[in-house]
Amino acid sequence: MSSTAVPRPKPWETSASLEEPQRNAQSLSAMMTSNQQDSRPTEESNNSNSASESAPEVLPRPAALNSSGTYGESNTIPGIYGNSNYGIPYDNNPYSMNSIYGNSIGRYGYGGSYYGNNYGSFYGGGYGAGAGYGMNNGSGLGESTKATFQLIESLIGAVTGFAQMLESTYMATHNSFFTMISVAEQFGNLKEMLGSFFGIFAIMKFLKKILYRATKGRLGIPPKNFAESEGSKNKLIEDFQKFNDSGTINSNEKATRRKISWKPLLFFLMAVFGFPYLLNKFITKLQTSGTIRASQGNGSEPIDPSKLEFARALYDFVPENPEMEVALKKGDLMAILSKKDPLGRDSDWWKVRTKNGNIGYIPYNYIEIIKRRKKIEHVDDETRTH
């Protein structure tokens, strides 16, 4: 009977022992689902309360403010690897928190901590909205080095301008030198031409002198020595007659002397001192008019302190573009500088200056204008009488 006896079943082969892990897993999943259902109403209530106290919708930004946005503000990578593809789908799948393998793939795999929601906590700073390439860190580096590169560019421009000035001076000197050489050559050619032209008259004069000697003074012209002797005799006779008439030979020369004129000296002084003064005045006037035109072109108007408006922030405002916009806290005071956009057009985004000295644009529905109290001048008179 001992050989035909049925062996006793082992403890792990019983149905109760096999069903026990399944019951534990089902109870664990039921507890987790109940916890999630209990937490959802509280989250919905919190979201409803925060929505009721949230700020109004931000007005659409003008094109002038959106033109300076950077790639750091876009949410392309967080949308792909964050809450859309790898965050929520893998978090709510059968392998998430509600199953036996919930903490392996759902929360720590692709769901919540490591790679989900902008790569989670360990890898979240890489491509999310907080650090790395997010929120203007790349543009901030570019802006910090922008002034240095502008300085280097200005230095290179100055050196290039100086080199161009030297080159233009050299070319002007070169051209003027060869121009003078060409002018000298032209004068030489003119001299040769005049010499050849007047040579004909010299030959004719020589022939007339020969004719004068051949005809014994009847034809032709007398020689030079004979003409000078005849002319000197005539001049002596004329001088003697003048001496008899006026008593002095140089009386006519004294009469013909001119008085010294001061006009050339005055014109010279006016050209030396007056012209630079007038030129300086003209340049100053041009600079003033240019500054006024530039300010009008930029849409900036002169600020009148008596007409300046003040406002108070009603809600917190976080700027998307810190270069053009300014951050606000509820209750902050500010002065409204302009109600126009950078292009000078009327806009819903106003330019303000906070108490901290920050200047930027904000939507007008986030602030409240503080009305000024009218001054009552006759009150002072009444107090004086009492």
From Swiss-Prot:
Lumenal topological domain ranges are: 1-263
Q: Where are the transmembrane segments?
A: 264-280
Q: Which gene encodes it?
A: PEX13
**What is an example of a GO molecular function annotated in this UniProt entry?**
protein-macromolecule adaptor activity
Annotated membrane topology is: Single-pass membrane protein
Might you name a Gene Ontology BP term for this protein?
protein import into peroxisome matrix, docking
Name the SUPFAM superfamilies on file. SH3-domain
Organism expressing this protein natively: Saccharomyces cerevisiae (strain ATCC 204508 / S288c) (Baker's yeast)
Ranges of compositional bias, category Low complexity: 44-55
**Origin superkingdom:** Eukaryota
Q: What is this protein called?
A: Peroxisomal membrane protein PEX13
| PANTHER family assigned to the protein according to its UniProt record, in alphabetical order | PEROXISOMAL MEMBRANE PROTEIN PEX13
Instruction: Please provide, in alphabetical order, the Gene Ontology terms of the cellular component aspect for this entry.
Output: peroxisomal importomer complex; peroxisomal membrane; transmembrane transporter complex
Key word Membrane present in the record? yes
Presence of keyword Transmembrane: yes
Q: Which residues lie on this side of the membrane: Cytoplasmic?
A: 281-386
Q: What does the UniProt record say this protein does? A: Component of the PEX13-PEX14 docking complex, a translocon channel that specifically mediates the import of peroxisomal cargo proteins bound to PEX5 or PEX21 receptors. The PEX13-PEX14 docking complex forms a large import pore which can be opened to a diameter of about 9 nm. Mechanistically, PEX5 (or PEX21) receptor along with cargo proteins associates with the PEX14 subunit of the PEX13-PEX14 docking complex in the cytosol, leading to the insertion of the receptor into the organelle membrane with the concomitant translocation of the cargo into the peroxisome matrix.
Fill in the subunit field for this protein. Answer: Interacts (via SH3 domain) with PEX14 (via SH3-binding motif); forming the PEX13-PEX14 docking complex.
Q: Where in the cell is it found?
A: Peroxisome membrane
In its miscellaneous comment, the UniProt entry states: Present with 7900 molecules/cell in log phase SD medium.
What's this protein's family per the entry? Answer: Belongs to the peroxin-13 family.
First-listed, main subcellular location of the protein, grouped into a coarse class: membrane
According to the record, the residues making up region (Disordered) are 1-76
- Biased composition of type Polar residues is found at 23-39, 65-76
Q: Which SMART domains does the record associate with it?
A: SH3
CDD domains linked: SH3_Pex13p_fungal
